Design a protein with these regions (language model features):
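Catalytic cores of soluble metabolic enzymes centered on carboxylation/carboxyl-transfer
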Residues: 3-165
Length: 165
């Protein structure tokens, strides 16, 4: 179809025939340190697990070497829901289920953006990051979140859950 349109042929349907079907939200997981002006990171992705039930575009596996010579984006994670809020909640859950260990990523930053009241209310603009930097880059909250994640992982491992082994 793209080739036909590029050749000047009309689309097979009109704008009035386009039907909206829910909401989609995409985040781009990058090997970047958000606290250091999104400085690209390189190294080995020691452990990788993509979230289930979401569209994830990636070419990663545990042990992937992230070189400094290419774009820092390592995965696109996309949710789709009947409403914007459903899509947002699915994406928040999916980011929480994403395991990207051994390399600094913007995963925590993305989670904070999706959970921020301004984003939740639909009021985010192109000034969102600059206007909300204090809460989006809160290092103490990040340490607490990582400690909670590690504690949960250790608890699951002690209960015999092999998903983390």
């Amino acid at each position: 179809m793209q080739l036909r349109v590029a050749s000047g042929e009309p689309l097979s349907l009109t704008q009035n025939e386009v039907a909206f079907n829910g909401h989609a939200i995409e985040v781009r997981l990058c090997a970047e340190d958000a606290r250091l002006s999104f400085m690209p990171q390189s190294g080995t992705l020691a452990r990788w697990r993509a979230p289930e039930n979401l569209r994830v575009e990636h070419a990663l596996y545990s042990g992937t070497e992230i070189a400094p010579y290419y774009d820092s984006m390592i995965a696109k994670i996309i949710s789709h829901g009947a409403t914007r809020e459903e899509a947002r909640r699915m994406l928040v859950g999916g980011l929480g289920d994403t395991v990207a260990l051994g390399l600094t990523t913007n995963q925590t930053f993305l989670s904070r953006c999706l959970a921020h009241p301004v984003f939740v209310s639909g009021g985010a603009t192109t000034a969102f990051i600059a206007d909300n930097s204090a809460s989006l880059f809160d290092i103490d909250a990040e340490i607490e979140a990582r400690a909670s994640a590690i504690a949960a992982m250790l608890l699951r491992m002690s209960a015999g859950d092999c998903a983390f082994n």
